[in-house]
Design a protein with these regions (language model features):
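A charged, well-structured terminal subsegment
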Residues: 109, 116-117, 172-173
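Surface-exposed amphipathic alpha-helices with a cationic face
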Residues: 133-137
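Short, well-ordered beta-strand core segments
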Residues: 117, 143, 161-163
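Generic N-terminal amphipathic, Lys/Arg-enriched alpha-helix
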Residues: 1-26
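Short glycine/serine/threonine-rich phosphate/pyrophosphate-binding segments
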Residues: 56-61, 125-132, 154
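Short alpha-helices
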Residues: 147-173
Length: 173
């Protein structure tokens, strides 16, 4: 490995650590507050509904999986669903309506007042995530947005904003 390669990897790791430190400082109170609200919603019989595109879709699936299975400790399963997993539903909505509707129609089908809608968009501008939040708000769901860059449209419309102050998709995700 060359010195230039080592320097490049070190710079990437330094950028990651700096982003993580900024995010920790800015989001710690919000994470604690929204964590309590998510616990309360689940205790009242609500569920977590996650969604996003690309890498954010994978994050949505991972989060839902950790809720249903376990995370760090043995515990009963928690109700969660990722709207990114059913290709028949996604492609039929995308084909018959528009890709911007793939999550909002599912929210209207499975979401209920008191549930949690957690959408992810590194830009904060993904039309299908924005529309899903609009649908979730109409139903009475609590909304959590995970964004980067400047937070986009999502920053103004969610109950809780988890904003990573970075323009780098790998750092945001």
């Amino acid at each position: 490995m060359t010195e230039q390669q080592l320097d490049r990897v070190a710079a990437i790791l330094d950028e990651h650590l700096a982003t993580a430190q900024r995010t920790r400082a800015s989001l710690l109170p919000a994470i604690v507050e929204l964590g309590a609200d998510v616990c309360d919603a689940l205790a009242r019989g609500g569920k977590l509904v996650t969604f996003g595109n690309g890498g954010s879709a994978a994050d949505a699936q991972h989060i839902a999986g950790e809720f249903v299975n376990r995370f760090l400790i043995e515990r009963p399963p928690l109700p969660a669903i990722a709207l990114t997993t059913d290709t028949s539903v996604i492609t039929s909505i995308g084909n018959d309506y528009h890709f911007s509707e793939i999550f909002s129609k599912q929210i209207r089908a499975v979401g209920q007042a008191g549930d949690i809608a957690w959408g992810m968009s590194t830009s904060g501008m993904s039309p299908n995530v924005v529309r899903a939040f609009e649908a979730a708000k109409k139903i009475g769901m609590t909304t959590i947005g995970f964004t980067g860059k400047d937070g986009g449209d999502i920053a103004k419309m969610v109950d809780y904003l988890l904003h990573v102050s970075s323009g780098s998709t790998p750092r945001i995700q």
